[in-house]
From Swiss-Prot:
InterPro entries: Nucleotide-bd_a/b_plait_sf, Ribosomal_uL23-like, Ribosomal_uL23/eL15/eS24_sf. This is Large ribosomal subunit protein uL23. Gene3D superfamilies: 3.30.70.330. Transmembrane segments: none annotated. It holds the Pfam family Ribosomal_L23. One of its GO terms (biological process) is translation.
Amino acid sequence: MEARDVLKRPVITEKSSAAMAEDKYTFDVDTRANKTQVKIAVEEIFDVKVDNVNIINYKPKKKRMGRYQGYTNKKRVAIVKLKEGSIDLFN
């Protein structure tokens, strides 16, 4: 899996914005990606050193539309802590 396939998009929420002050950045990642692949992708794309990676798996939720029932897509989020430096997400 290539680096651009691993990272989908940065997650910009109130909680993740507060974590950026501690050099922790949050990304939506591919559901098949592991911690090592996420670390290599962030280091390659943003040219920074990664300290550690935490991954959160979100299960699909049951949703209804009238009498029809289905599920939302499952999601995987990675929280990446940097050793030094920062990522400029707003350019």
